[in-house]
């Protein structure tokens, strides 16, 4: 569930916010066991799936500075794989978007919506992503995406996916001037 927020730093997914220490939720061993590095070593990430802490999600991804021993969060993503169930990703995505517009009604933001081939994972361009991105005037961004795997070969290892993510202003600036879409982790963009 989403919680009331005055700024992107106050926004929560399952009680986890930007600026929190990941150690408040997981052991150091859990974090390090699931750590991956970006192409640029300034930030690292952890993908933890599934976990009793967030039963409604198939997994969560967290981004923090590589050498930060407290694992302070600069990015939080909730993930839902749609294996074996009816894919109602668009409805859930729209519900999350509606909640964001209510929760951030006092904050100015720009919004863009697009459908595009999902080349980050599928070089054939068969798979697609439907994404809404909010960039907040006070810093930070949010993305809500439905990723549809249409390449038969990839369907063996990947599933359609809903991703709801939030990034700090520092992480957004780090990912710029290129598009955030260009950043890949195990085939999934941040």
Residue map of PLM features:
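Cleavable N-terminal signal peptides
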Residues: 2-3
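Amphipathic N-proximal alpha-helical interface segments
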Residues: 6-9, 32-102, 107-190
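N-terminal targeting signals for Sec/Tat export/insertion, comprising classic cleavable signal peptides
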Residues: 14-39
């Amino acid at each position: 569930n989403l919680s009331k927020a005055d700024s992107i730093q106050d926004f929560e997914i399952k009680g986890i916010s930007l600026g929190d220490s990941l150690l408040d939720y997981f052991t150091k061993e859990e974090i390090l066991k699931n750590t991956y590095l970006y192409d640029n070593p300034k930030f690292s990430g952890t993908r933890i799936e599934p976990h009793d802490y967030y039963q409604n999600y198939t997994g969560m991804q967290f981004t923090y500075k590589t050498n930060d021993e407290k694992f302070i969060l600069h990015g939080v993503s909730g993930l839902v794989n749609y294996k074996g169930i009816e894919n109602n990703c668009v409805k859930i995505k729209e519900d999350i978007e509606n909640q964001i517009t209510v929760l951030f009604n006092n904050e100015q933001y720009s919004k863009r919506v697009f459908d595009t081939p999902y080349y980050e994972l599928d070089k054939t361009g068969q798979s697609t992503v439907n994404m809404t991105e909010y960039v907040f005037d006070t810093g930070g961004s949010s993305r809500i995406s439905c990723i549809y795997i249409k390449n038969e070969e990839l369907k063996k290892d990947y599933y359609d996916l809903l991703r709801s993510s939030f990034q700090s202003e520092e992480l957004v600036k780090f990912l710029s001037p290129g598009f955030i879409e260009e950043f890949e982790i195990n085939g999934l963009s941040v």
